[in-house]
A protein has these predicted regions:
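RNA-binding accessory domains that recognize and position tRNA/RNA substrates
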Residues: 1-224, 246, 260, 358, ...
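Catalytic beta-strand/loop cores that center a nucleophilic Ser/Cys/Thr
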Residues: 305-346
Length: 375
């Protein structure tokens, strides 16, 4: 456990005027970001390294974070880097009720706080995170500053990488910007030696998606988000997860429309699901507070078979706008939101949740197998 008596004070300043005082953890610097929360009991290293969280301050509602440290990361090798979804922390900062400053696990590389310091990521402990989660849930578009005692906002070291001019005291909504150039690979890369080749459009892909494709015998070509798809030879396409508003992704939707004119299998995951939905003619709307947890139940349609899923998104498909040649595939059991759509005649499908999990339940990993079987 942390010793609060030896720690600097830090304040979380919210855009609605509220302030929460706690103790600084991690790196000593001020940061700003969109406030989001995750209700998972574990998987903090996967969440913090998930590119979908870029530009956001992540609140963990569970009472104790960090007790198993951070798993080893060997040479940025996604095949062996279990517990990591990219090569670095992507969150602006974190808020926890309590952090464990040691690590008791055979696979641990370093304690969580040491990882944060090395990656220059600050956080605050000692805050009632469940009350903070309620505040975020009840306030649409909430933003915040983590400000350590004696630290000036203009000295922030994790400025938004997608904004050229960032001024102090500014609350920035990252979803207003095209975040693809920040998180996508800059060059095409090939992994695996399988007979079937999948082109993965990197919108901020989680490493476990790549792992599961390779484990299932696929060769994958990871391509930048702005790639001319006509220059890529593949048996099928996967549009990956990623951060931000799917309507602020440049001409990606138009290029995916061209893919949907063909007959090769296409799978979308999370942001990729929203991109495919827009390309098919559906509309997207922002949710009041999003889904970010490991315990989101979904029903497969038709039928009433349920699956537990891992989710991380702020936007959803408007069910009234699903195109006539597409059908509802999955529905959220809690709020009846669209969790997946499927083309009625072509091998196109997309899901709002994460079938690759990491972290979370593996109930829907079969979706990747179904996609591969269509190649």
């Amino acid at each position: 456990m942390i010793n609060n008596l030896k720690r600097k004070k830090a304040v979380l300043e919210l855009s609605n005027g509220m302030k929460f005082e706690g103790k600084l953890i991690g790196y000593d610097a001020a940061v700003s970001g969109e406030m989001v929360f995750n209700t998972g009991m574990l998987g903090y290293s996967e969440s913090m390294s998930d590119p979908s969280y870029i530009g956001q301050i992540l609140v963990f509602s569970f009472c104790l974070i960090g007790n198993y440290g951070v798993p080893k990361l060997e040479n940025d090798n996604f095949l062996t880097a279990l517990g990591h979804e990219s090569s670095s922390i992507k969150t602006q900062g974190i808020i926890v009720s309590e952090i464990f400053d040691e690590s008791y696990h055979y696979g641990s590389m370093i304690p969580l706080e040491q990882w944060m310091i090395e990656q220059k990521v600050p956080g605050i402990a000692g805050i009632d995170t469940r009350y903070l989660v309620q505040t975020i849930r009840n306030t649409r578009n909430l933003f915040g500053w983590i400000v350590p005692e004696g630290c000036k906002k203009e000295n922030t070291i994790r400025k938004f990488p997608f904004i050229e001019n960032f001024t102090k005291d500014e609350y920035v909504d990252p979803s207003k910007f095209n975040l693809m150039p920040t998180v996508s690979t800059k060059e095409r890369k090939v992994f695996g030696t399988g007979k079937k080749k999948v082109a993965v459009v990197d919108c901020g892909v989680k490493w476990n998606i790549l792992r599961m494709l390779v484990d299932r015998g696929c060769q994958i070509e990871l391509v930048p988000w702005d790639t001319d798809f006509s220059t890529v030879e593949a048996d099928g396409w996967l549009i990956s997860n990623g951060p931000g508003d799917p309507r602020n992704t440049g001409d990606l939707v138009e290029r995916v429309k061209e893919l949907l004119k063909g007959d090769k299998p296409v799978l979308g995951i999370c942001l990729g699901h929203q991109i495919i939905s827009l390309a098919s003619g559906a509309k997207i709307k922002k949710m009041p507070y999003g889904h970010r947890s490991h315990n989101q139940p979904v029903f497969i349609i038709p039928g009433q078979k349920a699956f537990m899923t891992s989710q991380n998104h702020s936007y959803m498909v408007d069910p009234a706008t699903i195109a006539k040649d597409w059908s509802l595939w999955f529905e959220n059991a809690n709020d009846k939101g669209v969790e997946g759509i499927k083309h009625k005649t072509k091998p196109f499908m997309s899901v709002q949740f994460h079938p690759e999990a990491s972290s979370g339940p593996n109930d829907t990993a079969w979706i990747l197998t179904e996609f591969i079987n269509k190649l």
